[in-house]
């Protein structure tokens, strides 16, 4: 069976990591974008110090695109024919994220899918514990009243069949489904 002494998950590891990444940002606003796109990619190389420590590389990439629209006119700024798009902040956003781990993957460094920064509507790490993943999201944001805004979203994600590639197969042991989707909405309040 799987135990910490079988080499796949030693009771103690000492690792150092070297991180490299890049961003190509064409967003009109980094905090609350309504148009433009951003491409992010990164690589984190883990190197062992001592015995029984794994060597592996975590690769991640994401692409987000925001398109300004005017579909619903709840606020005064959105009802005006002369207001600019930034007075009537509405946007449709799309995001694609992916990642994989190359090398000797320790289970505690696996990708967890599900949660508020992953596939919303699922609990944190509720969908999968995997070596690779892909997620896609679409969201519509609209101002409702003064500082209150609303959003509708659709998220989906998959472990790309890689839960079995994690030593000890924690995703399978915990009955993680490996892929899923969600539809939902939310209310936000902008604060100064």
Each PLM stretch: what is its role?
Residues 15-18, 35-192:
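C-terminal transmembrane beta-barrel domains of outer membrane proteins
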Residues 1-10:
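Transmembrane beta-barrel wall of Gram-negative outer-membrane proteins
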Residues 4, 27, 32-34:
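Exposed, low-structure sequence patches enriched in small/polar residues
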């Amino acid at each position: 069976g799987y135990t910490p002494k079988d080499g796949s998950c030693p009771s103690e590891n000492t690792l150092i990591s070297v991180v490299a990444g890049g961003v190509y940002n064409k967003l009109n606003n980094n905090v609350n974008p309504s148009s433009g796109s951003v491409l992010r990619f990164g690589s984190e190389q883990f190197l062992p110090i001592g015995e029984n420590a794994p060597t592996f590389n975590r690769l991640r990439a994401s692409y987000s695109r925001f398109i300004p629209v005017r579909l619903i006119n709840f606020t005064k700024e959105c009802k005006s024919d002369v207001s600019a798009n930034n007075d009537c902040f509405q946007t449709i956003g799309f995001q694609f994220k992916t990642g994989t781990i190359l090398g000797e993957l320790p289970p505690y460094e696996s990708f967890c899918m599900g949660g508020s920064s992953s596939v919303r509507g699922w609990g944190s790490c509720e969908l999968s514990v995997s070596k690779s993943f892909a997620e896609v999201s679409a969201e519509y944001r609209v101002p409702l009243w003064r500082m209150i805004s609303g959003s509708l979203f659709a998220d989906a994600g998959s472990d790309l069949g890689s839960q079995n590639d994690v030593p000890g197969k924690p995703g399978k042991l915990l009955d993680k489904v490996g892929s899923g989707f969600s539809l939902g909405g939310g209310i936000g309040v902008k604060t100064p």
